[in-house]
Amino acid sequence: FMASAMKVIEIYYARPIITDREDAVDQTERLHGDVEFKDVTFKFGKHIVLDNVNFKIKAGQTVAIMGETGSGKTSLINLIPRFYDTNSGEVLVDGVNVRKRKLSQLRSQIGMATQDVLLFSDTIDGNIAYGDSDMSEEDVKHYAKLAAANEFVEKMPDGYETIVGERGVGLSGGQKQRLSLARALAIKPAILILDDTTSAVDMETEKYIQDSLRNLDFPCTKIIIAQRISSTKDADMIIILDDGKITEMGTHDELIAKKGYYYEVFKLQNDGF
């Protein structure tokens, strides 16, 4: 009991490390969605996770990130909403260092859906509309449809009023991922970050989701971590990470021509090509 009580006290008195600077930019208008990494190095302790990373993403582009487990993909995307700070270099959104932006304003315009999904103990409706109690039922269904979730939700006895999360019904990994994607889309983000979000869905559902993402009714920069070539081949730019460094960068055709890591993955997923 005492150990649990001490843990509660520790959490209660904890203070966030990442906070707004006194000179933080107050920008209430919608972001365009330009993202730039400029000489970014990031460490966990003494371990270098990202090593002098440089790239630019123009607003509205789709960029895919690939690499082996532990190559730094998730750490990279977590720097954009400033979950961590870089050790050196800059992460810029619309030309402004994220350290100089107000956290609430930055994060409110970044939608994230990850492989490991957290669902709140609430209705499906409440999970999708999380943070916006005024969202209409029509809008909730719209984003569920974009994420290929509407069909399985409507088959449930209580539909969108079904309770999920710790005290709710059990959902498959693919169903959870689709609800997480619907929640990320529902805020109409200027920047959408997907971390292996379709890893647990079948190929047909993945294709449906890709079509939805290509035809969103709002401007959006999309950054997608994926292991399937089917998820990356149509991206405007593909970034290959290896041990925290960018080893390849270009379009699908350009990387196939280089015959490096991307080409080997392509061959493997296409039965030797």
Where would I find each of the regions flagged by the language model?
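Cytosolic ends of transmembrane helices, especially the final helix of ABC transmembrane type-1 domains
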Residues: 1-11
